[in-house]
């Protein structure tokens, strides 16, 4: 799966979960300070991403992820591990 494809899927999830316009969900937008996500929103985002990509994001990794770029990198690494 390509970088842009992952980004677009995650962008859709974030926009839908947070009820915001897709165009403001950029790669560098911080979930809490830029997009207004609270801790519950973050948990729901992680769950939706896990479901969409059939991966597991451990809590300690989820706590380190603050923007879409980091999510995309994490998903790519997980998918590469699965496919090897």
UniProtKB/Swiss-Prot annotation:
Cellular component GO terms held in the UniProt record: chloroplast; cytosol; membrane
GO MF terms, alphabetically ordered: acyl binding; acyl carrier activity
Keyword list, A-Z: Chloroplast, Fatty acid biosynthesis, Fatty acid metabolism, Lipid biosynthesis, Lipid metabolism, Phosphopantetheine, Phosphoprotein, Plastid
Modified sites of kind O-(pantetheine 4'-phosphoryl)serine: 39
Function field: Carrier of the growing fatty acid chain in fatty acid biosynthesis.
Keyword Amino-acid biosynthesis applies: no
Broad class of the protein's primary localization: plastid
Gene name linked to the record: acpP
GO biological process: lipid A biosynthetic process
UniProt keyword Phosphoprotein present: yes
Domain called Carrier: residue spans: 4-79
N-terminal signal peptide: none
Record-linked InterPro entries: ACP, ACP-like_sf, PP-bd_ACP, Ppantetheine_attach_site
Localization terms from the record: Plastid, Chloroplast
Family listed: Belongs to the acyl carrier protein (ACP) family.
SUPFAM superfamilies: ACP-like (SSF47336)
Record note on modification: 4'-phosphopantetheine is transferred from CoA to a specific serine of apo-ACP by AcpS. This modification is essential for activity because fatty acids are bound in thioester linkage to the sulfhydryl of the prosthetic group.
Database matches in HAMAP family: Acyl_carrier
Name by which UniProt lists this protein: Acyl carrier protein
Pathway per the UniProt entry: Lipid metabolism; fatty acid biosynthesis
């Amino acid at each position: 799966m390509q970088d842009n494809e992952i980004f677009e899927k995650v962008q859709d999830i974030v926009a839908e979960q947070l009820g915001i316009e897709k165009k403001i969900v950029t790669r560098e937008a911080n979930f809490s300070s830029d997009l207004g996500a609270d801790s519950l929103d973050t948990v729901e985002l992680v769950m939706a991403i896990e479901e969409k990509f059939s991966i597991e994001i451990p809590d300690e990794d989820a706590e380190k992820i603050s923007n879409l770029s980091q999510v995309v990198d994490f998903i790519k690494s997980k998918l590469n591990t699965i496919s090897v």
